[in-house]
Regions:
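Long, intrinsically disordered, low-complexity accessory segments associated with secretion
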Residues: 15-450
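Sec-dependent N-terminal signal peptides
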Residues: 3-13
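Basic side chains
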Residues: 2-3, 439
Length: 450
Protein backbone atom coordinates (compact mmCIF):
# COMPACT_ATOMS: atom_id res chain seq x y z
CA UNK A 1 0.00 0.00 0.00
CA UNK A 2 2.80 2.45 0.85
CA UNK A 3 4.33 1.98 -2.61
CA UNK A 4 1.09 2.90 -4.35
CA UNK A 5 0.68 5.99 -2.20
CA UNK A 6 4.15 7.29 -3.10
CA UNK A 7 3.59 6.61 -6.79
CA UNK A 8 0.32 8.51 -6.83
CA UNK A 9 1.78 11.54 -5.07
CA UNK A 10 4.82 11.69 -7.37
CA UNK A 11 2.80 11.37 -10.57
CA UNK A 12 0.48 14.17 -9.59
CA UNK A 13 3.22 16.57 -8.53
CA UNK A 14 4.94 16.21 -11.89
CA UNK A 15 1.91 17.83 -13.53
CA UNK A 16 1.51 20.62 -11.00
CA UNK A 17 -0.59 23.54 -12.29
CA UNK A 18 -0.07 22.37 -15.87
CA UNK A 19 -2.65 22.60 -18.68
CA UNK A 20 -5.32 23.95 -16.37
CA UNK A 21 -8.36 25.97 -17.42
CA UNK A 22 -8.85 29.17 -15.42
CA UNK A 23 -11.93 31.38 -15.45
CA UNK A 24 -10.95 34.78 -14.12
CA UNK A 25 -13.45 37.15 -12.49
CA UNK A 26 -13.16 40.86 -11.78
CA UNK A 27 -13.96 40.29 -8.12
CA UNK A 28 -10.36 39.19 -7.50
CA UNK A 29 -10.79 35.43 -7.70
CA UNK A 30 -10.71 32.60 -10.21
CA UNK A 31 -12.19 29.18 -10.90
CA UNK A 32 -9.43 26.67 -11.67
CA UNK A 33 -10.03 23.34 -13.41
CA UNK A 34 -6.85 21.28 -13.09
CA UNK A 35 -6.60 17.98 -15.05
CA UNK A 36 -5.17 15.04 -13.07
CA UNK A 37 -3.84 11.74 -14.37
CA UNK A 38 -2.39 8.75 -12.48
CA UNK A 39 -1.26 5.76 -14.57
CA UNK A 40 -1.26 2.16 -13.25
CA UNK A 41 -3.05 2.72 -9.95
CA UNK A 42 -3.27 -0.62 -8.06
CA UNK A 43 -6.57 -2.06 -6.83
CA UNK A 44 -7.82 -1.40 -3.33
CA UNK A 45 -7.76 1.68 -1.13
CA UNK A 46 -5.19 4.38 -1.91
CA UNK A 47 -4.52 7.80 -0.38
CA UNK A 48 -3.43 10.64 -2.65
CA UNK A 49 -2.32 14.19 -1.89
CA UNK A 50 -2.06 17.43 -3.83
CA UNK A 51 -0.39 20.55 -2.45
CA UNK A 52 0.09 22.77 -5.51
CA UNK A 53 -2.72 25.03 -4.35
CA UNK A 54 -2.83 28.80 -3.82
CA UNK A 55 -2.57 29.81 -0.18
CA UNK A 56 -5.68 31.98 -0.64
CA UNK A 57 -7.80 29.01 -1.65
CA UNK A 58 -11.50 29.08 -0.70
CA UNK A 59 -11.35 26.06 1.60
CA UNK A 60 -14.91 24.86 0.99
CA UNK A 61 -14.63 24.99 -2.81
CA UNK A 62 -12.35 22.09 -3.97
CA UNK A 63 -13.85 18.94 -5.42
CA UNK A 64 -12.38 16.11 -7.46
CA UNK A 65 -14.23 14.44 -10.34
CA UNK A 66 -13.00 11.05 -11.62
CA UNK A 67 -14.32 8.31 -13.90
CA UNK A 68 -17.75 7.03 -13.00
CA UNK A 69 -16.50 3.69 -11.68
CA UNK A 70 -14.06 5.24 -9.22
CA UNK A 71 -15.26 5.89 -5.68
CA UNK A 72 -13.82 8.82 -3.71
CA UNK A 73 -14.30 7.70 -0.11
CA UNK A 74 -13.52 11.06 1.44
CA UNK A 75 -11.73 14.36 0.89
CA UNK A 76 -9.83 16.32 3.51
CA UNK A 77 -8.03 19.66 3.32
CA UNK A 78 -5.14 20.37 5.65
CA UNK A 79 -4.94 24.15 5.93
CA UNK A 80 -2.66 24.36 8.97
CA UNK A 81 -0.27 26.74 7.22
CA UNK A 82 2.68 27.85 9.31
CA UNK A 83 2.82 31.41 10.58
CA UNK A 84 4.84 32.97 13.35
CA UNK A 85 1.70 34.55 14.78
CA UNK A 86 -0.03 31.22 15.32
CA UNK A 87 3.15 29.49 16.49
CA UNK A 88 3.98 31.92 19.28
CA UNK A 89 0.33 32.39 20.25
CA UNK A 90 0.36 28.67 21.12
CA UNK A 91 3.44 29.12 23.32
CA UNK A 92 1.61 30.90 26.14
CA UNK A 93 2.96 29.58 29.43
CA UNK A 94 6.26 28.50 27.84
CA UNK A 95 9.77 29.86 28.33
CA UNK A 96 10.99 32.33 25.67
CA UNK A 97 13.82 34.78 25.14
CA UNK A 98 13.30 38.18 23.51
CA UNK A 99 15.95 40.47 22.04
CA UNK A 100 14.94 44.11 21.57
CA UNK A 101 16.44 47.03 19.65
CA UNK A 102 19.79 47.97 21.13
CA UNK A 103 20.75 44.38 21.90
CA UNK A 104 19.18 43.91 25.35
CA UNK A 105 17.67 40.46 26.03
CA UNK A 106 14.74 39.48 28.24
CA UNK A 107 13.63 35.97 29.22
CA UNK A 108 10.69 34.48 31.03
CA UNK A 109 7.30 32.82 30.70
CA UNK A 110 5.16 34.06 27.79
CA UNK A 111 1.94 35.53 29.18
CA UNK A 112 0.60 37.48 26.20
CA UNK A 113 1.33 37.66 22.48
CA UNK A 114 -0.55 39.92 20.06
CA UNK A 115 0.03 42.47 17.31
CA UNK A 116 0.70 45.29 19.78
CA UNK A 117 2.86 43.79 22.51
CA UNK A 118 4.43 40.74 24.12
CA UNK A 119 4.17 40.21 27.89
CA UNK A 120 6.64 38.08 29.90
CA UNK A 121 6.72 36.84 33.50
CA UNK A 122 10.31 37.41 34.59
CA UNK A 123 11.96 36.24 37.79
CA UNK A 124 10.56 39.09 39.85
CA UNK A 125 8.64 41.29 37.44
CA UNK A 126 6.13 41.32 34.58
CA UNK A 127 7.43 42.89 31.36
CA UNK A 128 5.29 44.29 28.52
CA UNK A 129 7.33 44.88 25.36
CA UNK A 130 5.96 46.69 22.26
CA UNK A 131 6.12 44.53 19.15
CA UNK A 132 7.87 47.21 17.09
CA UNK A 133 10.81 47.13 19.56
CA UNK A 134 11.37 43.37 19.20
CA UNK A 135 14.15 42.10 16.93
CA UNK A 136 14.12 38.40 17.88
CA UNK A 137 11.96 35.90 19.78
CA UNK A 138 13.62 32.61 20.71
CA UNK A 139 12.16 29.34 21.99
CA UNK A 140 13.70 25.88 22.15
CA UNK A 141 11.50 24.06 19.66
CA UNK A 142 11.82 22.23 16.39
CA UNK A 143 8.99 22.30 13.84
CA UNK A 144 8.70 19.02 11.99
CA UNK A 145 7.60 19.32 8.36
CA UNK A 146 6.15 22.84 8.43
CA UNK A 147 3.37 23.32 5.90
CA UNK A 148 3.43 26.41 3.70
CA UNK A 149 0.48 25.68 1.40
CA UNK A 150 -2.87 23.96 1.84
CA UNK A 151 -2.90 20.24 1.01
CA UNK A 152 -5.79 18.21 -0.38
CA UNK A 153 -6.00 14.54 0.61
CA UNK A 154 -8.33 11.94 -0.89
CA UNK A 155 -8.94 8.26 -0.33
CA UNK A 156 -10.09 6.31 -3.39
CA UNK A 157 -11.09 2.68 -3.83
CA UNK A 158 -10.45 0.74 -7.08
CA UNK A 159 -11.70 -2.72 -7.98
CA UNK A 160 -8.82 -3.28 -10.41
CA UNK A 161 -5.56 -1.71 -11.52
CA UNK A 162 -6.22 1.11 -13.96
CA UNK A 163 -5.32 4.58 -15.16
CA UNK A 164 -7.13 7.25 -13.14
CA UNK A 165 -8.05 10.50 -14.86
CA UNK A 166 -10.12 13.38 -13.68
CA UNK A 167 -10.32 17.05 -12.84
CA UNK A 168 -9.71 19.02 -9.66
CA UNK A 169 -11.89 22.13 -9.45
CA UNK A 170 -11.48 24.94 -6.92
CA UNK A 171 -11.92 28.67 -6.31
CA UNK A 172 -9.15 30.94 -5.10
CA UNK A 173 -8.46 34.61 -4.48
CA UNK A 174 -5.29 36.22 -5.74
CA UNK A 175 -6.24 36.54 -9.41
CA UNK A 176 -7.69 39.53 -11.20
CA UNK A 177 -8.31 41.14 -14.56
CA UNK A 178 -9.25 44.61 -15.71
CA UNK A 179 -10.14 46.09 -19.06
CA UNK A 180 -7.93 48.89 -20.38
CA UNK A 181 -8.77 50.92 -23.48
CA UNK A 182 -6.41 53.04 -25.57
CA UNK A 183 -8.26 55.80 -27.41
CA UNK A 184 -5.94 57.41 -29.98
CA UNK A 185 -7.39 60.58 -31.54
CA UNK A 186 -5.86 62.12 -34.65
CA UNK A 187 -6.65 65.71 -33.64
CA UNK A 188 -7.98 66.67 -37.10
CA UNK A 189 -11.50 65.29 -37.03
CA UNK A 190 -13.65 63.32 -34.63
CA UNK A 191 -12.18 59.95 -35.61
CA UNK A 192 -10.06 57.71 -33.38
CA UNK A 193 -8.61 54.24 -32.98
CA UNK A 194 -9.97 52.31 -30.00
CA UNK A 195 -7.83 49.42 -28.72
CA UNK A 196 -9.70 47.26 -26.15
CA UNK A 197 -7.29 45.25 -23.99
CA UNK A 198 -7.27 43.32 -20.73
CA UNK A 199 -4.58 43.12 -18.07
CA UNK A 200 -4.61 39.82 -16.18
CA UNK A 201 -2.76 39.55 -12.86
CA UNK A 202 -1.48 36.57 -10.88
CA UNK A 203 -1.18 37.64 -7.25
CA UNK A 204 -1.22 34.07 -5.97
CA UNK A 205 1.80 31.94 -5.05
CA UNK A 206 1.35 29.31 -7.78
CA UNK A 207 2.71 29.27 -11.35
CA UNK A 208 0.50 27.99 -14.18
CA UNK A 209 1.94 26.53 -17.38
CA UNK A 210 0.06 26.05 -20.67
CA UNK A 211 -3.00 27.70 -19.16
CA UNK A 212 -6.28 28.18 -21.01
CA UNK A 213 -7.70 31.46 -19.75
CA UNK A 214 -11.23 32.83 -19.77
CA UNK A 215 -12.34 36.25 -18.54
CA UNK A 216 -15.84 36.91 -17.19
CA UNK A 217 -17.37 40.39 -17.21
CA UNK A 218 -20.22 40.93 -14.78
CA UNK A 219 -20.83 41.31 -11.06
CA UNK A 220 -21.40 38.01 -9.27
CA UNK A 221 -23.10 37.58 -5.90
CA UNK A 222 -21.00 36.04 -3.12
CA UNK A 223 -22.28 34.25 -0.04
CA UNK A 224 -19.05 34.99 1.83
CA UNK A 225 -16.37 32.47 0.93
CA UNK A 226 -13.99 31.16 3.60
CA UNK A 227 -10.37 31.80 2.72
CA UNK A 228 -7.39 30.16 4.32
CA UNK A 229 -5.79 32.43 6.91
CA UNK A 230 -2.19 32.29 8.04
CA UNK A 231 -2.31 34.81 10.88
CA UNK A 232 -0.56 38.04 10.07
CA UNK A 233 1.44 36.35 7.32
CA UNK A 234 -1.04 37.19 4.60
CA UNK A 235 0.13 36.82 1.04
CA UNK A 236 1.56 40.12 -0.15
CA UNK A 237 0.04 41.84 -3.18
CA UNK A 238 3.52 42.70 -4.43
CA UNK A 239 4.25 45.00 -7.31
CA UNK A 240 4.40 43.13 -10.59
CA UNK A 241 7.83 42.01 -11.65
CA UNK A 242 7.15 42.15 -15.35
CA UNK A 243 4.53 43.24 -17.87
CA UNK A 244 4.18 40.90 -20.81
CA UNK A 245 2.52 42.37 -23.91
CA UNK A 246 0.98 39.71 -26.09
CA UNK A 247 -0.61 39.30 -29.48
CA UNK A 248 -3.11 36.93 -27.90
CA UNK A 249 -6.71 37.97 -28.55
CA UNK A 250 -10.02 36.85 -27.06
CA UNK A 251 -13.23 35.33 -28.40
CA UNK A 252 -16.31 36.90 -26.76
CA UNK A 253 -19.53 34.97 -26.05
CA UNK A 254 -22.50 35.23 -23.70
CA UNK A 255 -22.49 33.29 -20.42
CA UNK A 256 -26.01 33.52 -19.07
CA UNK A 257 -26.31 37.06 -17.73
CA UNK A 258 -22.59 37.68 -18.18
CA UNK A 259 -20.04 37.83 -20.98
CA UNK A 260 -17.04 35.52 -21.25
CA UNK A 261 -13.85 36.08 -23.24
CA UNK A 262 -11.73 33.03 -24.11
CA UNK A 263 -8.12 33.76 -25.04
CA UNK A 264 -7.01 32.36 -28.37
CA UNK A 265 -3.75 30.81 -27.11
CA UNK A 266 -2.52 29.04 -23.98
CA UNK A 267 -0.31 31.08 -21.67
CA UNK A 268 2.29 30.65 -18.97
CA UNK A 269 0.81 32.60 -16.04
CA UNK A 270 3.51 32.99 -13.42
CA UNK A 271 3.49 34.51 -9.93
CA UNK A 272 3.42 38.35 -10.07
CA UNK A 273 2.73 38.31 -13.82
CA UNK A 274 0.74 41.13 -15.42
CA UNK A 275 -0.11 40.05 -18.97
CA UNK A 276 -1.77 42.33 -21.51
CA UNK A 277 -4.01 40.71 -24.12
CA UNK A 278 -6.48 42.03 -26.70
CA UNK A 279 -10.17 41.76 -25.93
CA UNK A 280 -11.07 42.83 -29.47
CA UNK A 281 -9.12 43.88 -32.51
CA UNK A 282 -8.52 47.67 -32.74
CA UNK A 283 -11.55 49.58 -34.01
CA UNK A 284 -11.82 52.81 -36.00
CA UNK A 285 -14.60 54.84 -34.41
CA UNK A 286 -16.14 58.30 -34.42
CA UNK A 287 -16.75 60.37 -31.31
CA UNK A 288 -18.51 63.61 -30.50
CA UNK A 289 -16.72 66.26 -28.45
CA UNK A 290 -18.72 68.64 -26.25
CA UNK A 291 -17.50 71.23 -23.76
CA UNK A 292 -19.43 71.24 -20.48
CA UNK A 293 -20.05 74.17 -18.11
CA UNK A 294 -22.03 72.89 -15.12
CA UNK A 295 -23.23 74.88 -12.10
CA UNK A 296 -25.61 74.93 -9.18
CA UNK A 297 -28.17 77.73 -8.83
CA UNK A 298 -26.15 79.84 -6.34
CA UNK A 299 -22.76 79.42 -8.04
CA UNK A 300 -20.68 82.36 -9.27
CA UNK A 301 -17.38 81.41 -10.90
CA UNK A 302 -15.16 81.49 -13.94
CA UNK A 303 -13.26 78.39 -15.07
CA UNK A 304 -12.15 76.30 -18.08
CA UNK A 305 -14.80 74.00 -19.52
CA UNK A 306 -14.79 70.23 -19.10
CA UNK A 307 -14.03 68.23 -22.26
CA UNK A 308 -16.55 65.41 -22.76
CA UNK A 309 -16.32 62.72 -25.43
CA UNK A 310 -19.38 60.71 -26.47
CA UNK A 311 -19.02 57.36 -28.25
CA UNK A 312 -21.98 55.38 -29.58
CA UNK A 313 -21.49 51.63 -29.17
CA UNK A 314 -23.07 50.65 -32.49
CA UNK A 315 -22.04 48.62 -35.53
CA UNK A 316 -22.35 51.77 -37.64
CA UNK A 317 -19.65 53.28 -35.44
CA UNK A 318 -17.30 50.31 -35.74
CA UNK A 319 -18.38 48.78 -32.42
CA UNK A 320 -21.67 47.08 -31.52
CA UNK A 321 -19.90 44.91 -28.93
CA UNK A 322 -20.18 44.46 -25.15
CA UNK A 323 -17.64 46.81 -23.57
CA UNK A 324 -16.40 45.68 -20.14
CA UNK A 325 -15.87 48.27 -17.44
CA UNK A 326 -12.33 49.59 -17.32
CA UNK A 327 -9.96 52.51 -17.59
CA UNK A 328 -9.70 54.49 -20.84
CA UNK A 329 -6.37 56.11 -21.63
CA UNK A 330 -6.73 58.92 -24.17
CA UNK A 331 -3.95 59.95 -26.54
CA UNK A 332 -3.77 62.74 -29.11
CA UNK A 333 -1.65 62.83 -32.25
CA UNK A 334 -0.02 66.25 -32.51
CA UNK A 335 0.47 68.21 -35.74
CA UNK A 336 4.05 66.96 -35.80
CA UNK A 337 2.85 63.35 -35.69
CA UNK A 338 3.92 62.51 -32.13
CA UNK A 339 1.58 60.77 -29.69
CA UNK A 340 0.80 62.58 -26.45
CA UNK A 341 -1.23 61.53 -23.41
CA UNK A 342 -4.37 63.67 -23.09
CA UNK A 343 -6.24 62.25 -20.09
CA UNK A 344 -8.00 59.19 -18.77
CA UNK A 345 -11.40 58.22 -17.43
CA UNK A 346 -13.35 55.15 -16.33
CA UNK A 347 -15.75 53.42 -18.71
CA UNK A 348 -18.70 51.68 -17.07
CA UNK A 349 -20.10 48.42 -18.50
CA UNK A 350 -21.68 49.40 -21.79
CA UNK A 351 -23.92 47.04 -23.78
CA UNK A 352 -24.47 47.11 -27.52
CA UNK A 353 -26.18 50.32 -28.68
CA UNK A 354 -25.22 51.98 -25.40
CA UNK A 355 -23.47 55.33 -25.04
CA UNK A 356 -20.03 55.92 -23.56
CA UNK A 357 -19.32 59.29 -21.94
CA UNK A 358 -15.71 60.13 -21.11
CA UNK A 359 -14.18 63.16 -19.44
CA UNK A 360 -10.80 64.07 -20.91
CA UNK A 361 -9.98 67.07 -18.71
CA UNK A 362 -10.47 70.82 -19.05
CA UNK A 363 -9.96 73.00 -22.11
CA UNK A 364 -7.30 75.71 -21.93
CA UNK A 365 -8.80 78.07 -24.52
CA UNK A 366 -12.49 77.67 -23.67
CA UNK A 367 -13.82 79.26 -20.50
CA UNK A 368 -17.16 79.89 -18.85
CA UNK A 369 -18.24 82.61 -16.44
CA UNK A 370 -21.46 82.52 -14.41
CA UNK A 371 -22.81 85.66 -12.74
CA UNK A 372 -25.91 86.19 -10.60
CA UNK A 373 -27.17 89.55 -11.86
CA UNK A 374 -30.05 89.85 -9.44
CA UNK A 375 -31.33 87.83 -6.49
CA UNK A 376 -34.58 88.56 -4.65
CA UNK A 377 -35.96 86.38 -1.84
CA UNK A 378 -39.34 87.09 -0.28
CA UNK A 379 -41.36 85.25 2.34
CA UNK A 380 -43.09 83.03 -0.23
CA UNK A 381 -40.87 83.33 -3.28
CA UNK A 382 -37.37 83.47 -4.67
CA UNK A 383 -36.18 84.89 -7.98
CA UNK A 384 -32.73 85.12 -9.57
CA UNK A 385 -31.45 86.42 -12.89
CA UNK A 386 -28.44 84.58 -14.30
CA UNK A 387 -25.87 85.48 -16.94
CA UNK A 388 -23.50 82.90 -18.43
CA UNK A 389 -20.72 83.81 -20.85
CA UNK A 390 -18.76 81.21 -22.85
CA UNK A 391 -15.53 82.34 -24.54
CA UNK A 392 -14.03 80.27 -27.35
CA UNK A 393 -10.46 81.44 -27.98
CA UNK A 394 -9.83 78.22 -29.90
CA UNK A 395 -9.39 78.37 -33.70
CA UNK A 396 -12.18 75.80 -34.26
CA UNK A 397 -15.96 75.82 -33.93
CA UNK A 398 -17.17 74.00 -30.81
CA UNK A 399 -20.25 72.42 -29.22
CA UNK A 400 -21.06 73.47 -25.66
CA UNK A 401 -23.59 72.24 -23.12
CA UNK A 402 -24.36 74.64 -20.27
CA UNK A 403 -25.88 72.63 -17.41
CA UNK A 404 -27.82 74.34 -14.60
CA UNK A 405 -29.02 72.58 -11.43
CA UNK A 406 -32.00 74.25 -9.74
CA UNK A 407 -33.71 72.70 -6.73
CA UNK A 408 -37.30 73.06 -5.59
CA UNK A 409 -40.43 74.00 -7.52
CA UNK A 410 -39.27 76.43 -10.21
CA UNK A 411 -40.12 78.00 -13.55
CA UNK A 412 -37.79 79.53 -16.16
CA UNK A 413 -38.55 82.96 -17.62
CA UNK A 414 -36.96 85.19 -20.24
CA UNK A 415 -34.40 82.67 -21.45
CA UNK A 416 -32.25 84.18 -24.20
CA UNK A 417 -31.45 80.79 -25.71
CA UNK A 418 -33.29 77.52 -26.21
CA UNK A 419 -32.98 75.12 -23.28
CA UNK A 420 -34.06 71.57 -22.41
CA UNK A 421 -35.45 70.36 -19.10
CA UNK A 422 -33.53 67.16 -18.37
CA UNK A 423 -35.18 66.29 -15.04
CA UNK A 424 -36.82 67.94 -12.02
CA UNK A 425 -33.60 69.70 -11.01
CA UNK A 426 -31.67 70.13 -14.26
CA UNK A 427 -31.84 72.19 -17.43
CA UNK A 428 -29.21 72.58 -20.11
CA UNK A 429 -28.52 74.97 -22.99
CA UNK A 430 -26.98 73.42 -26.14
CA UNK A 431 -24.73 75.92 -27.92
CA UNK A 432 -22.67 76.06 -31.10
CA UNK A 433 -19.94 78.69 -30.88
CA UNK A 434 -17.76 79.78 -33.78
CA UNK A 435 -13.99 79.89 -33.57
CA UNK A 436 -12.63 82.88 -31.62
CA UNK A 437 -16.13 83.94 -30.63
CA UNK A 438 -18.19 84.07 -27.45
CA UNK A 439 -21.82 83.69 -26.48
CA UNK A 440 -23.88 85.05 -23.60
CA UNK A 441 -26.95 83.37 -22.09
CA UNK A 442 -29.37 85.06 -19.71
CA UNK A 443 -32.39 83.63 -17.93
CA UNK A 444 -34.45 84.03 -14.77
CA UNK A 445 -35.71 81.29 -12.50
CA UNK A 446 -38.54 81.83 -10.03
CA UNK A 447 -39.71 79.70 -7.11
CA UNK A 448 -42.92 80.09 -5.12
CA UNK A 449 -44.20 78.28 -2.03
CA UNK A 450 -46.98 78.64 0.51
Amino acid sequence: MRKSVCLLMFSLLLGQADQAIMTLYKDGFALVKQPVNWPNVPPGVSTIEYDQLPSRLFIDSPFLTLQDEIVVRWQRINSNIFSGEKFFSRKLGKYVEIKISGGKTYEGILLEYNNAKVTLQGKSEVLSIPRDKIELIFTEDRIENPQFKPTLIWEINLEKSMQVQGELIYLSAGFDWNAVYRLVMNGKDNQANLVPEAIISNRSDVDFSDLTLRLVEGELHHAGQKKISSGSQQYSRAQSSRLASSSVSADQKSLGDYHIYTLSEVLNFMVDDNITVQLYKPRVINYEKTYIFENKERSQREEPLVVELKIINSEENGLGIPLPAGKVEMYLTSKGGSLEFSGEDYLVQTPKEGTVLLTAGRAFDITGKRTILNYDRQRNSEEASIQIQIKNIHDEDIQVRVVEHISGDWVIRDASSMYTKEDATTIYFPLNIDAEDNKIITYTYRKEWK
